[in-house]
Amino acid sequence: MTVRVRLAPSPTGTLHIGTARTAVFNWLFARHQNGKFLLRIEDTDKERSKPEFTENILDGLRWLGLDWDEEPVIQSERIEVHRQAISQLLAQGLAYRCYVSEQELDAMREAQRASGQPPRYDNRHRHLTGDQEEAYRAEGREAVIRFRIDDEATIAWTDMVRGPMQWRGADLGGDMVIARRAPATTVGDPLYNLVVVVDDAAMAISHVIRGEDHIANTAKQLLLYQALELNCPTFAHTPLILNPEGRKLSKRDGVTSIGDFQEMGYTAEALANYMTLLGWSVPEGTEERFTLRQAAEVFSFDRVNKAGAKFDWDKLNWLNAQVLHGWSPAELLAALEPRWQKQGWVVSDPLWANDLAVLLGPSLTLIEDGVTQARPFFEEPPLEEDGLKQLEQEGARPALQALLSALELNAWDGLDVERAQTLLKEAAASAEVKKGVLMKSLRAALLGRLQGPDLITTWALLARLGHDRQRLRRCL
C-alpha cells in the first residue's frame, strides 16, 4: 500500500501554527514511508474563504520547506460529486430531508438544557410521511438533509496515537446534517463531514492525520464511509497545542500565525524543528535540533504523545539562536538587509554591512534582533540612563576629550585592534583614569548604553563612517 496523506486547510484565515504542525506531522510520515503528501483546499465556506488566504497558506508551507506531491485539490470544484453522494444516501433511505426550523431547533436545545440534558437533535423528522413533507413544503419551509445515525451503533477504530477508540451512536448528537438548508426539491450545499469522506476516498488517502479536536468527527465519518461503501483510512489524532498556562492555544495568546513568527524573525528551520517537537519525542540518542529531512528518517507515531503539548517560547528561542549562530555571514546579511531597508537604512558599502552582520550574529536570538542591535550603527542613539551615569564618572569626559583630540590630530587610514588599544591606553593615561573607565565611557558615547557587542569592532565600524568623532563630541 502506498501511503497517501493530506493537509486540508480552510482558506478562511492565515496559516495557523496548529495547522502548520499538522502539516509537519503529515509531511514527516509521508517522507518516512516513501509516500505522498497532498493538499486539499477546503474552500466551501463561500463567505469567509478568500484567495489571498489560500496563497498565504501555500506560501507558509513553502517557507517551512513542506513540499507537496500533486496539484492541490480545490474542494469547491467538486460540489456536484458531493451532491451525488448525498443523492445516493437519500435514494437508499440512509438520509432524509428535515424541515425543523432554526427557531424550533433553538427551542428544542433550550428545553434540553433546562432539563439537564446535553443538546442534541431528537430525530423528530426521521419518519415523515409524504403528506407531512408536502405540508411543510406548502408552508414554504426549506429542508436540511440529515444522515441517519443509529443510537445503538458502536463505532470503533484503532488510532495510531490513542490506540483502540470507541463511540456510541447515541453520543453523536442525533442524525447528522450533511447538506445546508435549501428548497425541498434540491440538495443544499454539502457540509464538512460528508465532503471530507467523499474527497479523502477520491484522493485515495490512506492515513488521516489531524488534531484530537476531530475525534468526534471521525466517529461520524466512519459511519459515512460504511454507508457509501468507501475504503476507510487509518486515523491518527495528534495532541492539541496548549499555551504556557495549559489552555488551548488561541488568537487571544497573540502570536499564532506562521506569518507572525516570520515577522518576529524566527527562521523556517527552527520553527519547523520546534513544531516537530510539539507532541513528538525524539528517539533516545537523537539530538533535539534537526532538519525536517533528518526528522523524517526517524519519525513514527509510536512516539507521538496523547497529552497536549505546551508551547515553550524559551525552547523555540534557543533553537532559533542555534540556527542563526550557524549561519554564514552571507546568509545572515541576506536575512538582515531587507529588514534594514524597511527601516530606511541605506548600506552603500557591502564590506561594511558584512562586517556588521559578523559582529551582531553571535548575539542574535531572532533575526529582528539584528534591527534593534544595528540601529546605533545607522542612527545616532539616545543616551540611556546607564550611559549618562557612566559619563558623569570622574575622569570620563576628560578621557573622551583626550581620545577625540588624538583622533583629530591624526589622519587615520583605518582603525585596527592594535591602533585602537594604543589610543585607549594613551588617552586614559593623559586623563589619569583607568583604561576600563575610558572603555565604558566610549561605549556609552558610541551606543548610548553600556551593553553591546565587542567595543573595538563597534568603534572601527562607526569610524569607517566617521560617526565615532561626532558621537564623542556630543558627550563633551
Curated annotation (Swiss-Prot):
It holds the Pfam family tRNA-synt_1c. It comes from the Bacteria. Transmembrane segments: none annotated. It is an enzyme of class 6 (ligase). Keywords: Aminoacyl-tRNA synthetase, ATP-binding, Cytoplasm, Ligase, Nucleotide-binding, Protein biosynthesis. Its EC number is 6.1.1.17. The keyword Membrane does not apply. It is found in: Cytoplasm. It catalyses: tRNA(Glu) + L-glutamate + ATP = L-glutamyl-tRNA(Glu) + AMP + diphosphate. ATP binds at K251. A motif ('KMSKS' region) lies at residues 248-252. PANTHER family: GLUTAMATE--TRNA LIGASE (PTHR43311), GLUTAMATE--TRNA LIGASE, MITOCHONDRIAL-RELATED (PTHR43311:SF2). Monomer. Catalyzes the attachment of glutamate to tRNA(Glu) in a two-step reaction: glutamate is first activated by ATP to form Glu-AMP and then transferred to the acceptor end of tRNA(Glu). This is Glutamate--tRNA ligase. It comes from Synechococcus sp. (strain CC9311).
